[in-house]
Amino acid sequence: MAIAGTVPTELGDKRIRDLLMQYAVPAIIAMTASSLYNMVDSIYIGHIKDVGSYAISGLAVTFPLMNLATALGTLVGVGASTILSMLLGQRNYKAANKVLLNEVLLNIIIGVAFSVVTLSFLDPILMFFGASQNTLPFARDYMVIILLGNVITHLYFGLNNMVRASGNPKLAMGLTVFTVVSNTIMDPIFIFVLDMGIKGAAIATVLCQLMALIYTARYFFNQNNYLHLPKSLRDYKLDIRIAKDSLTIGMGPFLMNSAACIVTLFINQQMLKYGGDLAIGAYGIVNRISFFFIMINMGFNQGMQPIAGYNFGAGKYTRVKRVFKLTVICATIVSCVGFIVSEFMPDLTVSLFTNDPELKELADKGLRLANLAFPLVGFQMVATNFFQSLGMVHKSILLSLSRQLLFLVPLIYFLPVFFGHRGVWMSFPIADTAAIVLSTILLLSLFRKFRKLNDGDDPAILGSKIKQA
């Protein structure tokens, strides 16, 4: 088995286009599978007889809570997988196994705590997140089951990250694809055949993750693997130092995911206030459609990161600029396809989620408005991840949070006063445009500094100048 941390020298020599495809395609498959995983539930739930419109609106109400659960997962998973990769690179397998064990224990502790607290106050939380008397029963039915299986979800995604970090990305991708395919098959059985409605969608989701978790657990309980979990329960003790390091490293991604939770909460509240239950359902549909294209671009970004980071560290700035430009081109093409789908065939895509005429009309108009600036969104995403790839974390976080908190949240509260729920939709392209302008300013500053350096110059020189900027 390949060891994570082994330096792939091809990153500095192989043709950039071939490298980007080599690294991006598996990530795109995994990201697309993740987005389809979320879409499948929405599509089937939206077609539940007689109550589909309110059911999909109830599902949309749960988005902030789901985002918060994801944020807690990244808090543990990102930090632990980062430390694990470093230890494997040092061939310190004993310490790596301790990190793996602590990742499991932290996920159990956080998963149980989140479920207990949330279940204790579920109805007030859902009402705060935008539920009404019409949508609360559906949101509650879905979340009760999801929360009961929350530990399974945390353990599965956490261990899947560890599989990837340990040098087996194909297995991690395969498990993701498996959950999507099995969920697609099981959803209609539980929702329609067994007539369980939105509860059936939640049960199918948890069962699919349980099956994937069982396989992943078997992988890590194999004592012949250099990375494995202990069999004796006496060995399951939390190491405070490892836990602290993992949570510290994961704090950045946690904050960014938490920002998404806050933004979704505000959107739901404003949609309910100015447009009613169906407006929230329309946002849920638009969110799922847009998310599909965004996740493809995330795959390109994941492919770019190791290439840009390696060549930056090696002082090969020409290759750094080349991979950035190629990734921007690819992401822009994807974003333009998303724009065409949104502007010229919204009815076709929205019809996948609902047959309700009123909900379809709201989602059609919302999709057109929300994605007006979509052709440039790919560029902004690449810029954010480019700074992260070069170790300029503060600029990356600034670009990510500015779009959501600095630009989008004020617009969500300001524009509906004048334009009703249409103002919420209008907030997206305006915030995207503002974020694109900020990204361009930061990138121009960076590339001006690149021009002063030749390939082979010490990257620390560039880094020190950037810190002073």
Q: Model-derived features: where do they sit?
A:
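Short alpha-helical transmembrane segments in multi-pass integral membrane proteins
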Residues: M1-A24, L84-V151, V193-G250, A308-A373, ...
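N-terminal transmembrane alpha-helices
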Residues: L11-V51, P64-G79, I83, I108-S115, ...
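Transmembrane helical elements of multi-pass membrane transporters/channels
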Residues: Q22-D41, I145, T179, C208-A212, ...
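Helix-terminus/linker motif at the lipid-water interface of multi-pass membrane proteins
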Residues: T32, L36-S57, L126-Q133, I189-M196, ...
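Membrane-helix interface/capping residues of multi-pass secondary transporters
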Residues: S42, S53-I56, Y93, L122, ...
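Small-residue-rich hydrophobic transmembrane alpha-helices
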Residues: I56-V116, T153-A172, A282-I340, F344-P346, ...
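Hydrophobic transmembrane alpha-helices of multi-pass small-molecule transporters
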Residues: L68, N183-P188, L213-A217, F291-F292, ...
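Short runs within selected transmembrane alpha-helices of multi-pass transporters and secretion channels
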Residues: I146-R164, L175-N183, A201-T216, N297-N301, ...
